[in-house]
From Swiss-Prot:
Positions with a binding annotation for ATP: 182-189
Protein's name in the database: ATP synthase subunit alpha 2
Entry superkingdom: Bacteria
Keyword Protein biosynthesis assigned: no
Annotated Basic and acidic residues bias: 545-590, 623-641
SS bonds (residue pairs): none
Organism (species): Burkholderia pseudomallei (strain 1106a)
Region described as Disordered: 527-666
GO cellular component, one term: plasma membrane
One function term, GO molecular function aspect: ADP binding
Membrane-related topology note: Peripheral membrane protein
Main location: membrane
Compartment annotation: Cell inner membrane
């Protein structure tokens, strides 16, 4: 017989069951979305230039999305007592007076997430590359609050751009806002795209925002990143000049929201805004159309606040929030180099530094045309790699002194040897920081180059040979490191070993000798000299500028070092190789110097004409060789003559060798 529970226990069980059922019912009711029975409908009073003035929607929120009859959308830009100024985000062909308008209760949002990587979208996340529509499962408002002070951390990690003058003198840190400013067509976008392309070997997600740009210019940027960079980790937010002003206005905010998705998850992101000058012009246009009171240069009074609240969203988050970072490279355009204009001064005061590009330097074929006197990074050495900071300690001072001395040398020559040495050092620095597009340097390459410069290894070489040195150095260092690394050895941090860096910097002297020998051999054989600037074909087709033959020769020299990994054996083999190269280079350079000496201005004219008057023989062949070599392009004939000018006895021997070579050619 089964015992029955007593009456009090049964009552407690029934009460518990009833309470649970009631809690479940209340939860279900709370999850029910209740829609209003009645919805307010407004009417368009007038529409013009992408702005619709709507009445009857007094409860509309600022920046709320409104939907017009026919599917056109817009957002509330200004709220007056009687009218709402709505900025249209679509073509206004279907919006006319008395068109019905309804509230949505939502603010502007943009899709965010990994599905955006590699895509070209508009500021609303709509594809522009012909791909599939994006999944809108995760969206973010385009207007988000900047991180609070307690949520930020110090900027202490470098954002490597691969551009020597930027990394060495104006270091950009992860979480920093560095303004790129200059006149039109001075290479502002090129410098920013170089920074994006250099992130192909890093963990940085890049977002490029184009505002009011030509479609052809945007296409060139996208093609450059796809060809040279890592497009699978880039997002392109495009609001071209032909689109609605509303899309151009929200474009930078949408780009920052997309980048913040990755920053909030502990990743690192970089946003390039191209450019904020056009964004300011769009904001002024919308303000004047909505009859806001104009201020300085007809800009509304809130233009500073608009850009400040945008750029303040770039930050380095604290470790408690994941340690992610969002760096910003806004671009601004000046008029005739006027940095004191309204928008440039606003942006300079908002950002953490500026890189000023000068049109005169650009016209002088210096790429990038960075004005070292006006450029600054307010983070600087705090985020710079210790080895690079130590190697670039005197670079800015030496270059500034050179620019000052160069200005004085235009009025007369210098007789002081110390001043001439400074001029020589400055010319090499200028050649070193002149860097073509898409020729990014690693931090190791930059440190070794600067150490070799500080040691005086570049003082004896022609400035025309600095560009080939910069081009061939990465492959040379890779081969040298591979030769000096034992098999199955763990990876070595070469940047943390000062002795190893000094050894690599000393080995640059061998590469300089090879480059000088190759230049002399090319001049003797009549081959065109290597392009000093290295910018062949502009944005495209420049990857062939670095000669395959030069790389093969460098690898062949370093392959000898791999026989012994000890430093003593490496130095011995390097000396043997350099001796062979130097012997061959001396022979070729002597013959080349003889030809140069034959064409020197100080040589008597009868001496040049006498061999041509002879009927036949070696002197005539020598004269023919002189005429042929004079018609060929030469890198720096005067510099070659100065470096290889022989003694009288050596000059006679060189003439004999040159005559024998000419006779052999006949």
């Amino acid at each position: 017989m089964t015992p029955t529970p007593d009456a009090p226990a049964a009552a407690d069980a029934d009460a518990a069951t009833g309470a649970g059922w009631l809690a479940r019912r209340r939860g279900a009711l709370a999850r029910v979305a209740l829609a209003p029975v009645a919805q307010a409908i407004g009417r368009v009073e007038r529409v013009a230039d992408g702005i619709a003035f709507v009445s009857g929607l007094e409860d509309t929120m600022l920046n709320e999305v409104l939907r017009f009859e026919g599917g056109v959308t817009g957002f509330a830009h200004t709220l007056d007592e009687d009218l709402i100024s709505v900025v249209l985000l679509d073509p206004d062909a279907g919006v006319r007076a008395q068109t019905a308008v309804a509230r949505t209760g939502a603010v502007l949002e943009v899709p965010a997430g990994p599905q955006l990587l590699g895509r070209v979208v508009d500021p609303l996340g709509r594809p522009l590359d012909g791909g599939a529509p994006l999944d809108a499962a995760h969206t973010l408002p385009i207007e988000r609050a900047a991180p609070a002070i307690i949520e930020r951390d110090l900027v202490s990690e470098p954002l490597d751009t691969g551009v020597l003058i930027v990394d060495a003198l104006f270091t950009i840190g992860r979480g920093q806002r560095e303004l790129i400013i200059g006149d039109r067509a001075t290479g502002k976008t090129s410098l920013a795209i170089d920074a994006i392309v250099n992130q192909r070997h890093s963990d940085v997600i890049c977002v490029y925002v184009a505002i009011g740009q030509r479609a052809s210019a945007v296409r060139r940027v996208i093609d450059a990143v796809r060809r040279y960079g890592a497009p699978e980790r880039c997002v392109f937010v495009v609001a071209p000049a032909a689109c609605a002003p509303g899309l151009q206005w929200i474009a930078p905010f949408a780009g920052f929201s997309i980048a913040e998705y990755f920053r909030d998850r502990g990743q690192h992101a970089l946003v390039v805004v191209d450019d904020l000058t056009k964004h300011a012009a769009t904001h002024r246009e919308l303000a004047l159309l909505t009859r806001e009171p104009p201020g300085r240069e007809a800009y509304p009074g809130d233009i500073f606040y608009v850009h400040a609240r945008l750029l303040e969203r770039a930050a380095k988050l604290s470790a408690a929030l994941g340690g992610g970072s969002l760096s910003a490279l806004p671009i601004a355009e000046t008029d005739a180099g006027n940095l004191a204009a309204y928008i440039p001064t606003n942006l300079i005061s908002i950002t953490d530094g500026q890189i000023v590009l000068d049109s005169a330097l650009f016209a002088a074929n210096q790429r990038p045309a960075v004005d070292v006197g006006l450029s600054v990074s307010r983070v600087g050495g705090k985020a710079q790699h210790p080895a690079l900071r130590a190697a670039s300690g005197r670079l800015r001072l030496d270059y500034a002194q050179f620019l000052e001395l160069e200005a004085f040398t235009r009025f007369g020559g210098l007789t002081d040897a110390r001043l001439r040495a400074q001029i020589t050092r400055g010319e090499r620095i200028r050649a070193l920081i002149t860097q073509p597009r898409f020729r990014a340097l690693r931090t190791l390459d930059e440190v070794v180059l600067l150490k070799a410069l500080a040691a005086g290894a570049l003082d004896a070489m022609s400035p025309d040979l600095v560009a080939p040195l910069r081009e061939r150095l990465p492959a040379w260092l890779d081969a040298r490191i591979a030769a000096l690394t034992p098999a199955l050895a763990p990876p070595r941090d070469w940047l943390a070993d000062d002795a190893a860096l000094d050894a690599l910097a000393e080995s640059v002297g061998e590469l300089i000798e090879r480059i000088a020998a190759d230049a002399a051999r090319r001049a003797t054989a009549g081959m065109p000299a290597e392009d000093a600037a290295g910018d062949i074909g502009g944005a495209f087709g420049g990857e062939q500028a670095r000669g395959d033959a030069d790389r093969d020769a460098d690898h062949g020299a370093n392959r000898e070092v791999s026989r012994e990994v000890s430093p003593e054996a490496s130095r011995e083999v390097s000396r043997e190789v350099s001796c062979e190269v130097s012997h061959e280079a001396d022979r070729d350079a002597a013959a080349d110097a003889a030809r140069v000496a034959g064409r020197a201005p100080g040589r008597a004219e009868p001496d040049r004409a006498a061999p041509r008057a002879m009927p036949d023989g070696p002197p005539r062949a020598q004269a023919d060789g002189d005429r042929a070599s004079a018609s060929r392009p030469r890198p720096d004939a005067r510099g070659d003559a100065a470096r290889t000018a022989p003694s009288p006895q050596g000059g006679a021997d060189a003439n004999v060798d040159a005559e024998a070579e000419a006779r052999h050619k006949r």
